[in-house]
C-alpha cells in the first residue's frame, strides 16, 4: 500500500546537417524517472552540439555537452532506520495499514503521527521530511584542429575543458527517530570544479627503401581545481519547519576545501624499423608538477624497447614458423597528491564550549620530496 506506480519517460529531439565543407549536429533529451516511493523522482537533461569543418589541408572539430540532474530525495533505500521497506516489513507488520498514517503529523513540524513513538519513523514522514536533495550541472567542451604540412608531416592541437557545480541539501524535521538529529536538522553543501587539458603535436611518418620511421614531439598542459564548502546545524532547529543555518540551536559546524593542480609536460617518441624485421622505439617525457617542491618539480622519464623477428633473418626448422626476441627498459614517475608537501592544521569547530581546535599533523614531510619512480626491465621471446 505504500509503494506507488513508477514510470520513466524519455524524450529526444535532434538536428543534423552535412555540407561540402563540414557537418553540424545538435540534440536535446529529457529523462524523467518516477520511482515507486513517495517523493522519489529524477530529472535528467542533456544538450549537445558539435560539428566539423575541412578546408584543404586544415580541419577542425569541436563540440559541447551540457548535463543537468536534480532530484528531491535520494534517501529511503537499504537496511536501517531510514529504509522505508525495512520499517514496514520488520517493525510495522500486517496489523497496521500504513495508509492510515499518510497524514504523518500529529503536530505540524513538531510531532509525527506514527504507531511507534520510540524506535522507528512513519515511512511517509521519512519520504517527505527526512530528505537529501541534489542539483548537479556539468559542461564538457572539446576542440581539435589539424594541418597537413606535408603528406608525411602534420601538426595538431586538441583542447578539452570540464566544469561542474553541485548543491546538496539534507534535512529532517523534529521528532525523527532515525534521522540525523531528533530535534531537527539542516545541511547544505556547494562544490564547483574545473579541469582543462590541452596538447599540441607535431607528427611524422615516412618510409624510404627498407627503412620506416615515425614519431612525434609535443606538449601538454593540465589544470584542475575543486572548491567545496558545507555547513550544518547543531543540536536541532530553533524554529520548527524552518530549514536554515540561521535556525541552528548551537553555532553551526562548517568545513571547506580547495584543491588546485597544474602539470606541464613535453614529450616525444621515435620509432624505426628495417625490413619489418628490426624494430626500435624510444620515448622521453618531462613533467613539471605544481604538487612538488620547486627543487624537484621537474622530472624526466625515458623508455626504450626493441624487437627482432629472428625467423626473418635465420632459416627456421619446419616445426618453427615464427620466432621473435624482444626487450624493454622503462622508467615511470608520478607526482604527489595535492598538499602532500604543504601540510596545514586540521581545524575542528565547536569542539568544547563553543571553542575550536587546530591540530598539526604528526608526520612532517621533507620539503625536497621527489616524485615516485619505478623502473622495469623486460627480456623475452615468442615463437610458434
Could you describe each region identified by the protein language model?
Residues 1, 35-37, 46-138, 156-264, ...:
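Surface-exposed loop/interface segments of Gram-negative outer-membrane beta-barrel transport/assembly proteins
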Residues 2-3, 10-32, 36, 48-54, ...:
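Predominantly transmembrane beta-strands of Gram-negative outer membrane beta-barrel pores used
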Residues 7, 36-39, 290-296:
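Solvent-exposed loop/turn segments connecting transmembrane beta-strands
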Residues 8, 12, 23-27, 59-63, ...:
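Membrane-spanning beta-strand positions in outer-membrane beta-barrel proteins
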Residues 14-16, 27, 50, 142-144, ...:
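Outer-membrane beta-barrel architecture
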Residues 300:
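Phosphate/anion-contacting hairpin/loop surfaces
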Amino acid at each position: 500500500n505504500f509503494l506507488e506506480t513508477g514510470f520513466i519517460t524519455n524524450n529526444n529531439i535532434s538536428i543534423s546537417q552535412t555540407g561540402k565543407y563540414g557537418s553540424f549536429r545538435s540534440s536535446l533529451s529529457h529523462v524523467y524517472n518516477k520511482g515507486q516511493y513517495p517523493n522519489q523522482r529524477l530529472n535528467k537533461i542533456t544538450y549537445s552540439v558539435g560539428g566539423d569543418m575541412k578546408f584543404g589541408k586544415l580541419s577542425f572539430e569541436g563540440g559541447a555537452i551540457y548535463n543537468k540532474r536534480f532530484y528531491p530525495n535520494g534517501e529511503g533505500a537499504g537496511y536501517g532506520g531510514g529504509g522505508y521497506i525495512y520499517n514496514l516489513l520488520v517493525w510495522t507488520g500486517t496489523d497496521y495499514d500504513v495508509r492510515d498514517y499518510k497524514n504523518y503529523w500529529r503536530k505540524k513540524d513538531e510531532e509525527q503521527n506514527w504507531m511507534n513513538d520510540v524506535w522507528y519513523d512513519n515511512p511517509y514522514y521519512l519520504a517527505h521530511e527526512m530528505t537529501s536533495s541534489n542539483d548537479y550541472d556539468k559542461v564538457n567542451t572539446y576542440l581539435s584542429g589539424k594541418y597537413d604540412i606535408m603528406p608525411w608531416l602534420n601538426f595538431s592541437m586538441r583542447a578539452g575543458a570540464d566544469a561542474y557545480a553541485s548543491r546538496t541539501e539534507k534535512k529532517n524535521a523534529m521528532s525523527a527517530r532515525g534521522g540525523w538529529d531528533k530535534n531537527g536538522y539542516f545541511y547544505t553543501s556547494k562544490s564547483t570544479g574545473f579541469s582543462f587539458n590541452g596538447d599540441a603535436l607535431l607528427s611524422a611518418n615516412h618510409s624510404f627503401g627498407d627503412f620506416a620511421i615515425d614519431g612525434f614531439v609535443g606538449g601538454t598542459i593540465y589544470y584542475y581545481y575543486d572548491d567545496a564548502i558545507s555547513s550544518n546545524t547543531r543540536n536541532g532547529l530553533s524554529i520548527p519547519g524552518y530549514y536554515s543555518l540561521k535556525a541552528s540551536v548551537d553555532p553551526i559546524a562548517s568545513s571547506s576545501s580547495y584543491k588546485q593542480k597544474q602539470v606541464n609536460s613535453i614529450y616525444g617518441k621515435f620509432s624505426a624499423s628495417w625490413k619489418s624485421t628490426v624494430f626500435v622505439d624510444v620515448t622521453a617525457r618531462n613533467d613539471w608538477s605544481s604538487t612538488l617542491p620547486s627543487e624537484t618539480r621537474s622530472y624526466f622519464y625515458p623508455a626504450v624497447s626493441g624487437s627482432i623477428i629472428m625467423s626473418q633473418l635465420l632459416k627456421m626448422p619446419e616445426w618453427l614458423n615464427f620466432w621473435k626476441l624482444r626487450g624493454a627498459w622503462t622508467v615511470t614517475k608520478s607526482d604527489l597528491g595535492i598538499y602532500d608537501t604543504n601540510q596545514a592544521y586540521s581545524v575542528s569547530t565547536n569542539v568544547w564550549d563553543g571553542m575550536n581546535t587546530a591540530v598539526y599533523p604528526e608526520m612532517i614531510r621533507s620539503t625536497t620530496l621527489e616524485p615516485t619512480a619505478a623502473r622495469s626491465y623486460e627480456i623475452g621471446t615468442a615463437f610458434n
